[in-house]
Amino acid sequence: MPSAAFTAVPTLKSVKKIQFANTEDKQEFSKYPTKAGRRSLSRSISQSSTDSYSSAASYTDSSDDETSPRDKAQVNTNGSSDFCVKNIKQAEFGRREIEIAEQDMSALISLRKRAQGEKPLSGAKIVGCTHITAQTAVLIETLVALGAQCRWTACNIYSTQNEVAAALAEIGVSVFAWKGESEDDFWWCIDRCVNTEGWQANMILDDGGDLTHWVYKKYPSVFKKVRGIVEESVTGVHRLYQLSKAGKLCVPAMNVNDSVTKQKFDNLYCCRESILDGLKRTTDIMFGGKQVVVCGYGEVGKGCCTALKALGAIVCITEIDPICALQACMDGFRVVKLSEVIRQMDVVITCTGNKNVVTREQLDRMKNGCIVCNMGHSNTEIDVASLRSPELTWERVRSQVDHIIWPDGKRFPLSLHHPAALALIELFNAPEGRYKQDVYLLPKKMDEYVASLHLPNFDAHLTELSDEQAKYMGLNKNGPFKPNYYR
């Protein structure tokens, strides 16, 4: 989902710099909207690196760029005003971005073509809270093509592509999101998606659990009509399991994060490319010979390590899990404690989904020019809040890059940055009683179906089992071919 670091500005040798990048930021909020808090989050926090390369990403209307979207009166060409985006005039640019994304998302386009006539989501009213990027827009438009009505907001205050949000609003999707939301804006947008007259959701698609949390806290009666929750992230899945353990989960929930297609393709392969893309775009750093520590050796961490090692970086790992630590050792990486190596590192990357993985004390000890980058789900992995202190100075140096300057001159730049469709179809169409009030993994048959949708794009041809072979292996010829515990 919908990743980066930053160039050090040349200084005298005595001046220290640390570079900080946050690639897949997800905030943890505990406050709810207040009128006074609408602009409570400083604008000096930079935008997500999920920006497109195209002119659309840099398109702005200078006449109202500083105006909060909540204060604007906007309508699309059909006269609808049931949305709140940065600038509806960006829709044409966003449409180009979505069309480009469609070319690389053959599985969703194939699903759209195969199931469009059946309309398996006819009657579904889906409220979604995810990153709003061109890729997510392809998912949303697929859900609409399959019969669903959608209302959407962003799970991340930094990652929304404004032009894509405008394009979705232009075709009638009720979108409430823009890049650089304040904390109050974030909750206001979620509330506008859920609390609307004459429309009540019966499905939830969440990334991080904030939407689910908001509905539980403010509108628990909504769950009387909700058929299920689909959760995409490890953080959100963890929150669902906590609800289930406490006996408070009142609808079935589908854990998409742990599906094979999500784990391998989104978490491993996509992160393997996006880490380099983000770092290169913002720093032009040469990785050969750089000392890098990656915190966490899950699928995201594995992808980052593979990419960095291939470019000649010297990579070590921090891990709490002995199995993942052993995997790292067998893959040729040294397993260390962050406190042991923090002074020598050129790059620090967090991929855990936990909190306080990199503390203020460790930030203070980092060498000048160190790049600090979050590839995990939550921006609490790095103690950014502690950097908002009187003794530190924030300085905007260029678009998407702020320098945070220590009293001794040290500084770092700061930038904060689909199996889901099948899961929605499965939960929405499941007969009553199939799923109880618990958290479920995507059925392996559906996971394999998602994978099969991608294969034509690679001109891949599956070998078919003979009846004798299928009997010998104890498998159905049409699958599933892996047990449910396979990851």
Where are the language model's segments positioned?
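Long, low-complexity intrinsically disordered regions in eukaryotic nuclear regulators
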Residues: 1-55
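Rossmann-fold NAD(P)-binding glycine/threonine-rich loop
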Residues: 16, 20, 27-30, 36-37, ...
